[in-house]
Each structure stands twice: as C-alpha cells, then as structure tokens.
Amino acid sequence: VQWMGFDGNAHNHNNGDVDIGRLSVMAGLNVRDGEAILNPFLGKSFALAAVTTNYELNVDKPLSASSKNGRGIGYWLGMGSAVPGIEWGRREKRATHLSAYPLETVKKVERPTTIILDDEVPQVPKRAEFFARAEAGDLGEKSRVERGRFAFKHPFAMSMVSLIKRMVPEQDGQVYKEKVDNYNDPGANAKALKSISYLLGSEMTGICEIPRYAWYSNRKDGSEIPYKHKYAVVMLVDQGYETMEGASGDDFISGAQSMRAYMRGAEIAGVMAEHLRSNGFSSRAQTNADSDVVHIPLVLWAGLGELSRIGELVLNPFIGPRLKTVVMTTNMPLEVDKPIDFGLQKFCSSCLK
C-alpha cells in the first residue's frame, strides 16, 4: 500500500493501535460467541493481523450470528473454489513429517537421473552467477545497465524485497555451546525437521548430504567459503497454482509470486536454523538473497525432482516448475532421502519436438 503512495500501518495482537478482534467482526471475518470470537470455518484456531490505510476500499458486511458453523455440505465438497473439507481431513490423517503430496510413493533411485560426474564437476565462485556476471559487465553493456531493473515491476513484489533483505543478517548466528544430547537419532531428527518445515509453510522437504560441488568456492569479495556443514534440508515453496493460471504473462504478477515464495522460504529456513543453533548445532539458512550453496544439485539429491529441459530447473512430479527453493545447511545428524525417478527423462527422450 505504501509503495502505491498511500499511508498504511500494520497491527497485530502485541503491537498495534486498534482493536483487531472488533475489526475482524466488523469486516465480516468472525462472529462473537459471548466473550469469544469464532470463525465459521476455523473456530478459534487463528491469529489476527490488520492493516489500516487511507487507500479507499469497499467495505464488507458483518456476518450473521447464525454463521458460526460454516462447515456445511458446500465446505466438504469444496464449492466456491475452496479446498474441500474432505481434503483437509485427508491431510490431518497424514503423519506430520509427510507433505500434503504423496512424495513418499514416488520411485527412489541411488543417483539422480541426470548423469553427474562427481569428480569432474568444478566448484564455482559466487562471482560466476549470471546475475553477478551481468552486474560486472561480462555479458555486455546492455545487460550491465538492465541488471538493476529487476523483475519486481509490481508494488506487491517491491513490498517484499526489503523484508527479504532484512532477514539476511539472521541467516547465520551464534551457536550455543551446550549441545543438547538427546538428538542422536538421525531418523528421528529428520522427521522432526520435516514436521517443523511443514508447520512453517514448506510444500515439500527433502534431506541430502552436501556434495563438494554444491558449495560455492568463494564469495563475491574473494574470501573462501568453508564447508562447515554436512547436511542440507531442502524445501520447496509453491508459487500458487491459481495465481499462475490466472496470470496473463504481461501483468508482472510472476515477480510478486517469486518474491512471496522467497520471503516465505527465508522465514522458514531462518527460524529452523535459529532453532538448531539454540540446541548447539551449527546451521545456516541459504536463501535467494545470500546462499553459500548451489541449490539445483541439492534439490536433485534430496529427492524433490528431476532435471528438466526448461533451462536449469528441477521439475517436481506434483507441482512441476511452480516452485522456489530454500535450503538450510546443518551439522545435526540426519537421515538422508534418495533421488527420485518419476519418468521425466524417458518422457523427454521420447519427445519429437
């Protein structure tokens, strides 16, 4: 809202100038039940936040007092483009370390389906990133000039950029000296981290050991990047099917989709890394804003997809290329996942296009 030129302030339960509960009733989100506030679909299981602004908006009407229970037949069947209630029921029955998608049913293999000659793959410095090369003028003057005009192009996307940048200092930090002793089971640790990732908003999560070539060799200033972690927890963030299907291709909404996924990914990995550091395990969030590792090989080894022919992109069997990645590297003992084979290489090798 501020990027569009209007005043706007955020409010939550702990920090705000308004009665958010009352506003939620007036805005048609909740109804009062005595002293309690209920949502027709969520009951009491929600938190509230609000934005106040002078941006002129149409107002919603309060809900009828009879709207306390919205879980009728329409809810369970998903009428009105909502996720069906029966689908929520299915997800609730799955173990917490499993995603909403049945990734565990996909065929597992010992190595990624794209040939990787481990001893021949060189490490590259962060200066070799194409964004960095364009910025330095390696790709010509036009690319150097246009590098600064990134694909935000939308107030919604721009509003998330500052938050993404502000989380960078929190990606790494002090490790508490007293390591907790009851984290010696790699399998239990892996399940716990996956459960946390899904609670925080990851779509799918996999774990792998970090190969040598997945580490950048040097930072942009020339300093060496140490290989201080053994494991990578790799997470996919869905960019949104409905938004992608509704985009025209020239409305710049894809920039907002990217920034939202990057912002959420940085939050998820940042919280998880801080949690592990507080338990004595060195951990770091590796995000789009600052990463010491190359994500593509880690996504392959963590069993989250196969390398496609859409440029340098890993295709997931359930959400395709509609994803952004975030990684948390750590030394906590973890059980690793295997790469997957859902037939992509066979399909592409049979293509006549």
Per-region residue spans from a language model:
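Iron-sulfur (Fe-S) cluster-binding modules
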Residues: 65-208, 229
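Catalytic cores of enzyme domains
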Residues: 1-70, 194, 203-353
